[in-house]
């Protein structure tokens, strides 16, 4: 999802998203109000921040800014995973493969995300699924990254 699509999704969830001058964070959520740092340079980067903040809305409760607390770190992980799935998802990785993306830069461009966010998503997927996972007729390997389309033989 690109930034505009995420803004629409946030609106449909009843969330109010505003771009504001922030220091110390790229995005913050309080209740149903999301603030995105106004001076973030690219729409792709803003979309990554917004996806994570929507993830916080859907999965977190309370103030989790203190990442020294185990429960705060768990909530942060859940919110990021939700954001990765919303913004990229396993199907997004397959779509990038089908579109002929040959490297991380091309995949990030195709998925309208930053390379760093894509790397973090793949690390998170690796932690969740292990070395690989199967989606429909595809095997997605996370280390090293590869997508393989399985062809079934006709009997």
Descriptions of predicted regions:
Residues 1-49, 54-155:
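Active-site hotspot residues in diverse enzymes, especially metal/ion-binding acidic/histidine motifs
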């Amino acid at each position: 999802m690109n930034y505009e699509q995420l803004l629409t999704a946030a609106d449909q969830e009843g969330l109010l998203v505003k771009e504001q001058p922030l220091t110390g964070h790229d995005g913050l959520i309080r209740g149903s109000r999301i603030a995105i740092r106004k001076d973030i340079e690219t729409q792709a980067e803003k979309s990554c921040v917004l996806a994570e903040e929507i993830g916080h809305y859907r999965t977190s409760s309370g103030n989790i800014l203190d990442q020294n607390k185990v429960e705060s770190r768990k909530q942060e992980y859940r919110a990021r995973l939700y954001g990765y799935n919303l913004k990229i998802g396993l199907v997004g990785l397959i779509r990038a493969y089908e579109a002929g993306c040959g490297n991380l830069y091309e995949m990030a461009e195709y998925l309208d995300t930053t390379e760093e966010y894509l790397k973090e998503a793949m690390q998170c997927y690796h932690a969740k699924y292990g070395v690989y996972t199967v989606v429909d007729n595809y095997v997605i390997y996370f280390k090293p990254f590869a997508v393989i389309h399985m062809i079934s033989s006709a009997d």
